[in-house]
Amino acid sequence: MKSHIVITGGAGFVGSNLISYLLKKTKFKIVSIDNYSTGKKKNHLDSKRVKYIRGDTININKILRKYKNNINSLFHFGEFSRIYQSFKNFNKCFESNSIGSKEVFKFCLDNKIKLIYSATSATLGKKGKDKNLSPYAFTKSNN
C-alpha cells in the first residue's frame, strides 16, 4: 500500500490546514514541499508523520525521487499566488505556475499518482471574457 501524501505549498495557509486535517483523519505520512516565498515555518505542525522539504515544484522529480513509489496522492497548492506581485515578477510567476505545474503534472502522470489541483477564480473573470487580466490569471488559466 502506498503510504504517503504529498502537498506542494504545505507551509501556506491552505496547505498547512490540509496537513492538519489529514493528520487527524488519515494514517498517511505527509511530505510537504514549499519554497517559502509566501509559506511560513510557523505553519509547520509538530508530527513525526510530516516531512518538510524546502524546494520548488520545478525540481519535483529530484525532490521526490526516494518517495515516488510510495505516494498515494499529491495536492498541488505550491504556486505563485499573488495577483498584484505577478505584474512585477512575471518571470517568477510564469516559472512557478506554468513550468513548475507542468513538472508536477508530468511527475504524477509518469508515476501513476492521483493529483488534486487547486485552481483559482481569477481565471474566470467576468464570465470568462476578461480572464487574463493579470499574469497570475493568465498562467493559471493555461494549466
Residue ranges and their predicted role:
Residues 1-143:
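N-terminal Rossmann-like NAD(P)+-binding domain of SDR-like oxidoreductases, especially those catalyzing
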